[in-house]
């Protein structure tokens, strides 16, 4: 919900947080942070087939919810490792999209902020599906991406952005980890 009027800038009345009547704990209706990595190798993109609802059976980018105090870059690397067995180091942000987690509508408690990174697949390491996480993993060329996609509110836009990024250099904005670098990063050329 917006906090200010888009026309005049005046503050808008904000709804109070949802509060538990039993223990008085407040629950804010903020978006849940999620992170994923567009893992590529030789021009192909690694996708996973979801093993669980929502969107069970649909193709998705490896990713998931960020843990408490987990940097999105770390979450993206962890999710790729858990779902595919690959060790990657996300190197640049592709973009961010807001969406609903569940297919039954944009309920305020299901809103997600999805942060996607580029990552190169290491060497010739084979990706393998962890059956506790995903049903299948597969590599797809940019012009052969599957039609059955999870999260249709944002994933098609993510894949369009990935395809477009493959045609230009630099691909995206480099991401800074939690640590402040000892020196300024080299400018992107």
Language-model features and meaning:
Residues 66-92, 97-154, 158, 170-171, ...:
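Unchanged
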Residues 40-82:
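Conserved Nudix-box catalytic region and its N-terminal flanking loop in Nudix hydrolases
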Residues 161-167:
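A short N-terminal helical cap/helix-turn-helix that marks the beginning
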Residues 7, 19, 46-47, 60, ...:
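Conserved beta-strand segments that form the floor/walls of ligand-binding pockets within enzyme
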């Amino acid at each position: 919900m917006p906090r200010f009027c888009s026309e005049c800038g005046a503050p808008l009345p904000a709804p109070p947080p949802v509060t538990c009547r039993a223990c008085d704990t407040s629950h804010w209706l903020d978006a849940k942070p999620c992170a994923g990595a567009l893992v590529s190798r030789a021009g192909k993109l690694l996708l996973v087939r979801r093993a669980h609802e929502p969107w069970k059976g649909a193709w998705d980018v490896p990713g998931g919810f960020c843990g408490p105090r987990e940097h999105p870059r770390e979450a993206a690397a962890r999710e790729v490792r858990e779902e595919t067995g690959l060790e990657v180091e996300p190197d640049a942000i592709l973009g961010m999209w807001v969406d609903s987690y569940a297919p039954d509508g944009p309920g305020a408690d299901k809103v997600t902020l999805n942060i996607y990174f580029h990552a190169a697949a290491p060497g010739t390491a084979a990706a393998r599906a962890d059956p506790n996480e995903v049903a299948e993993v597969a590599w797809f060329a940019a012009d052969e991406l599957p039609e059955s996609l999870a999260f249709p509110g944002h994933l098609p836009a993510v894949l369009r952005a990935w395809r477009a990024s493959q045609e230009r250099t630099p691909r995206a904005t480099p991401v800074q980890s939690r640590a402040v670098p000892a020196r300024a990063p080299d400018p992107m050329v």
